[in-house]
Structure formats: structure tokens, C-alpha cells
């Protein structure tokens, strides 16, 4: 199939595709023109609600927009910027896990619950305890355990939640912590952890987080762990590597292996790594998608009716307005050794 724009009537982005009850549902961000100035922290992305679309034929069938399923005004703790989200099912309930900024300008993850995948979703009154940053991906493993992968740099604030250690003779002797006092979260002790100092490309790249969810899918059941992407020699990718993690975590499983895929941010690629369990480490494999039109790239990978698909977005319909993005889909294929064939955007 040729790449297909799924819903050209509106600007949707950051697609999280899931199969529920034999139908494919996509939970996107909802772009609009807020008039906010462009900045490196994503202030021009002022999304304020979520919709869900569904289809029974990905390649040619009708796409239904089920309307708004959650608005920022319904979320007591959130002020603005309803960024990426994902939905997972457990025991007949559907859990929307989303990212938004609170009234201190700090991103957290929240949960909203529905009886149907079409919503509407009712939000919890408080964000997930100890949550931070953006871009949650909710992954349900074969044993029923649910894991959430999350994190994004720059405007996604992931860099706030690492003690920045001295890693260079020119760096200060005492660690510098960029965390705001209003944003304090407990991600567990890490006294010897070295992380990325901006401008130090030989430091280990900042990883995303993964955490197993509680039985009610409303809280973390443990301290989040780092999702480490390593090279073929077993070494973590460096901050200066254009293939290192930046944002947009996604997890899927193929032939018993765990595929962690992500956006590289300022190098604008989708890349992936493979591991043997949900926590990793994950060994870097390659590029899934080269840069598209627009600054961000964000995706999901899902099997539906025997065919694998890559869902993503670009800014071609809006003439390269980076905060007005459009959903896109095309087929995805594996090689015999389990590696993913690079997808060519058209």
C-alpha cells in the first residue's frame, strides 16, 4: 500500500494504535493553531483535548472520528498541553494514560478510565504519584502485566529528573540538579549514575523510563527503571549519537522479542532496539523511518488482521507548519532474522 493520510479533516499527531474488540483504534494528540510562538520547549504545541478514531480496514476503509474523549478542563490537576497518550485494556476497562502540564508548568502523567475504547474517559483527580515527563506508551505483556514507557527531552523535561554528574574535567565538581522545587518526584536513588550534560556528546545518552503499573492501572507499582539502549558491544549509546533516544517511546512484541522504538528528536529519525524482557537492555538495530516533513516524528507499531503497520505523522498537508500535523499509516515488514525493514515515506 502507499502511505495513507488517515484523517485529513483535522490535525492529529502522535498516534497510539491499539486493537480492541476486533477493531483498530488510534489515540492521537489533537493539534490546533493556538498562536503560540515557536520555542525549543514546545510551547507552540498547545493541545487541549483528545479524540479517538477507529477503522476496520486500515488500507482503504472508512475512518470514524468518535469525537472528544477528554478535555483539559476536565482534569483538575492539569492546566494545558495535553501531549501524547495511549490506552490499555484490563478486565473490560480502558485506561487512558496521558501527559499534561500542571499549574506549575511541570509535566506529569495522568490516568482516565472508560467502559469502552471509544470513551468518554473519566480522569483521576491527581496525576500518577512520582510521574514526570511525557509520551507514555502502555504495553500489556502476554502474562497480563502492564508496563508504561515514558520520557522526552527538552520540553518534555526528562533532563530535570537526573542528577547531572561531573563527567568531564571542565564540568563542576558538585552535581547540578536542574529539577524545579515544585517538580520534585522520587525516581529512586542513583548516586553514581552518569547522565547527559548538554554539550558533552561522549556522555551516556539520557534514557527513557519503564515502570510496571499497579493492579488497578492507576499508579506505579515500583520505582521507574531506565530503558538503556546499547550498541553491539554492550555499551550504552552516547549523547552525541544521532540514533540515541529523545522521546516517543513505543513497545511491541514480535516472535517473543521486545522491540523498543523511539524518536531521536533533533536528528528526526525513528529507531529501534531489541531486548529479551520488558526492562531491557535493548540492543540497537537500526532506523525504521528517516526524517519526515516537520520537526517531530512520533509513531506506533501494531499488527492488525495479519499485517503489521507503522502509524506516524508529518506536516505535508499543513505546508510544513510543525505544530499542525497529520496522521499517516503504511505497512511494516520484518526480515527473516527479525529485523525491521526500513519504511520509505512518500
Model-assigned labels for residue ranges:
Residues 1-346:
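Carbohydrate-active catalytic/glycan-binding domains of CAZyme proteins
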